[in-house]
From Swiss-Prot:
Superkingdom, natural source: Bacteria
Taxonomic lineage of the native organism: Bacteria, Bacillati, Actinomycetota, Actinomycetes, Mycobacteriales
Keywords linked to the UniProt accession: Amino-acid biosynthesis, Cytoplasm, Histidine biosynthesis, Lyase
Pfam family, one: IGPD
Cross-referenced NCBIfam families: PRK00951.1-6, PRK00951.2-1, PRK00951.2-4
The protein's name: Imidazoleglycerol-phosphate dehydratase
Gene transcribed to yield this protein: hisB
Documented EC number(s): 4.2.1.19
Family: Belongs to the imidazoleglycerol-phosphate dehydratase family.
Enzymatic reactions: D-erythro-1-(imidazol-4-yl)glycerol 3-phosphate = 3-(imidazol-4-yl)-2-oxopropyl phosphate + H2O
MF (Gene Ontology): imidazoleglycerol-phosphate dehydratase activity
Organism per entry: Corynebacterium efficiens (strain DSM 44549 / YS-314 / AJ 12310 / JCM 11189 / NBRC 100395)
PANTHER family named among the record's database cross-references: IMIDAZOLEGLYCEROL-PHOSPHATE DEHYDRATASE, IMIDAZOLEGLYCEROL-PHOSPHATE DEHYDRATASE HIS7
Length: 202
């Protein structure tokens, strides 16, 4: 089993955004985040810190229109960088879950580093469709962010909001729970020397 840090990088430039991401799965939670969207920066910082990922995200987007393009395109690039960092999947734990509270909110994230991209979100209260945090982050985009992340990193991801009222608390618990579940799923398992699949491939 290799002991070299697993580092992934990806970039994306379009007429709507210019994004660079680097992630070290074997980091300590050192982050360098700048998307021009303060609440999104806060969420990505939480993602890096609670995943113990060294994470750099630099994004310039058409935020004068809205946050959607920058958030979704960042998810594309973060997913691609995550896929790059995971590599051949030899020796990883593969499956993991995390239940994470934030005050009145409780969120669960379940991850399979499967090579089969799939996403499910369930349980968010109806007001998450219309809530806006900090005047710029519409919480309806949570679903788009995590779905895009799952598709581009080729993982299976389920996010369940068991309960909660405050859109900030629900959103932050989602980001932290996904980070914690990913952290555990990509950990190296000392008892697993090959690819964790009966098929021999993921």
């Amino acid at each position: 089993m290799t002991t070299a840090p697993r580092i992934g990088r990806a970039t994306r430039t379009t007429s709507e955004s210019d994004i660079t991401v680097e992630i070290n799965l074997d980091g300590t939670g050192t982050v360098d985040i700048d998307t021009g969207l303060p609440f999104f920066d806060h969420m990505l910082t939480a993602f890096g810190v609670h995943g113990s990922f060294d994470l750099t995200v630099h994004a310039k987007g058409d935020i004068e229109i809205d946050a959607h393009h920058t958030v979704e395109d960042t998810a594309i690039v973060l997913g691609q960088a995550l896929l790059d960092a995971i590599g051949d999947k030899k020796g990883i734990r593969r499956f993991a879950s995390c239940q994470l509270p934030m005050d009145e909110a409780l969120v669960e994230a379940v991850v399979d580093i499967s090579g089969r991209p799939y996403f499910v979100i369930n349980g968010e209260p109806d007001h998450m469709i219309s809530a806006v945090i900090g005047g710029h982050y519409a919480t309806v985009i949570n679903e788009h962010f995590f779905e895009t992340l799952a598709l581009n990193s080729r993982i299976t991801l389920h996010v369940i909001c068991h309960y909660g009222r405050d859109p900030h608390h629900i959103t932050e618990a989602e980001y932290k729970a996904v980070a914690r579940a990913l952290r555990a799923a990509v950990e190296m398992d000392p008892r697993q020397t090959g690819i964790p699949s009966t098929k021999g491939a993921l």
